[in-house]
């Protein structure tokens, strides 16, 4: 387990001040979701939330105080408008009043692939000093929602979080929390990180992972498996550029296979995005097949299709990741937050069985 470095805890505020990098569909669902659940009863089980109140923080305690993007239709606009602008096409679940948070121009770096570049217009505004912007907004947690393949850009924002003393939630498959060098940077700086690569509430990865483990636990030899995903959002369009996919395929594959005892040949496990289908909008369809052998080596195959709205499915997990990062910051913890990362992320520094990871997260919440 990665070491946590603890300091005397600073005085905790009653809110979680969040900055967002990448005002796309996932950001849209998160911002709308905070509004949607603003008056949720924290004494009841509420559909769509694992925790109405996560430690001391209710969903409504999440406040958006800064945002960064490169899209000309988002930069310079209020966050409440930007989340519905340009190519954003997720389902609308709530009206969002003006936030008085103006989306700022971040550096582009490698954040825009060729399909993005053909689709959106880049803002001609000068990139801001991100570290200074984080400090001025008194940000507690920075959430990175950059496009898949944004290796340089994601690490740039991770360093900005360290320099500004801001907790970091790494929602994309760039290996930062799970990279010992970066984990040490966060630990040494006494800055918490939750990562890498967000799991959905009930998505292709978590269902595939659970069913593969079920095969193993029930004595069925899993011989081969595949997972194909199609969707109509900018994430899937971006992933048509296969050069940007390496870390995504690794992350999704190890999220499934790391839960199993046996090793698989590369050809026997195929997990990854398949294609972009524009009319699906922000919906994702996953096709999953598991082939195994049961009693007497008799074939046993399982095939299913999962249909989800991709971004709300992610937001239901990010809302907990953000609050976990804030609790770690309140407690003076630096480095990877293992319980939150193991339960909420595909590629945490330490892979744990889901039941153990969940139990550890509940213990972490209690403190």
Curated annotation (Swiss-Prot):
Was identified as a natural substrate of the M.tuberculosis proteasome. It holds the Pfam family Inos-1-P_synth. One of its GO terms (cellular component) is cytosol. GO terms for biological process: inositol biosynthetic process; phospholipid biosynthetic process. Key enzyme in myo-inositol biosynthesis pathway that catalyzes the conversion of glucose 6-phosphate to 1D-myo-inositol 3-phosphate in a NAD-dependent manner. NAD(+) binds at residues 78, 137, 157, 200, 235, 248. It comes from the Bacteria. The keyword Mitochondrion does not apply. Pupylated at Lys-73 by the prokaryotic ubiquitin-like protein Pup, which leads to its degradation by the proteasome. NCBIfam families: mycothiol_INO1. The keyword Isomerase applies. Its EC number is 5.5.1.4. Its cofactor is NAD(+). Coiled coil: none annotated. The modification N-acetylserine is found at residue 2. This is Inositol-3-phosphate synthase. It is an enzyme of class 5 (isomerase). Transmembrane segments: none annotated. Belongs to the myo-inositol 1-phosphate synthase family. There is a cross-link at residue 73 (Isoglutamyl lysine isopeptide (Lys-Gln) (interchain with Q-Cter in protein Pup)).
